Amino acid sequence: MKLGSAIPWALLFSTATLISTGWGLDYHACGGRLTDDYGTIFTYKGPKTECVWTLQVDPKYKLLVSIPTLNLTCGKEYVEILEGAPGSKSLGKFCEGLSILNRGSSGMTVKYKRDSGHPASPYEIIFLRDSQG
């Protein structure tokens, strides 16, 4: 990784630390349109089995998305990241591990889906406007 590309990742990790320690906006609801410069989506524990969050920042900036906490039951639940609005190309479905995504876009969609009757497992999804645009 070149130094120029390492800077946004360092900013993401340092900002993720700030957000997870009380700086930032926390979302626990199932889905919605989020237009803040940064925030954290936490495990939704309600009755709905599918949640869709549309993330959008000013078009002159890019979004960085990090999934530092993801311990889902593979085969029964997943988080999917789309490169734009709902219905856009999928960047992947994730059920465990650490994932960091930067697609050069000002909008992304995050979808959480689980089987009916299966309890929600813990996840944390951090989004952040890239200050370097």
UniProtKB/Swiss-Prot annotation:
InterPro entries per the UniProt record, alphabetical: CUB_dom, Sperma_CUB_dom_sf, Spermadhesin
Signal sequence bounds: 1-24
Major site of localization recorded for this protein: secreted
Start and end residues of each CUB domain: 30-130
Keywords on record: Disulfide bond, Glycoprotein, Secreted, Signal
Gene3D superfamilies reported for this sequence: Spermadhesin, CUB domain (2.60.120.290)
Subunit structure: Monomer or heterodimer with PSP-II (depending on the type of glycosylation of PSP-I).
Protein name per UniProt: Major seminal plasma glycoprotein PSP-I
Record organism: Sus scrofa
Upper lineage: Eukaryota, Metazoa, Chordata, Craniata, Vertebrata
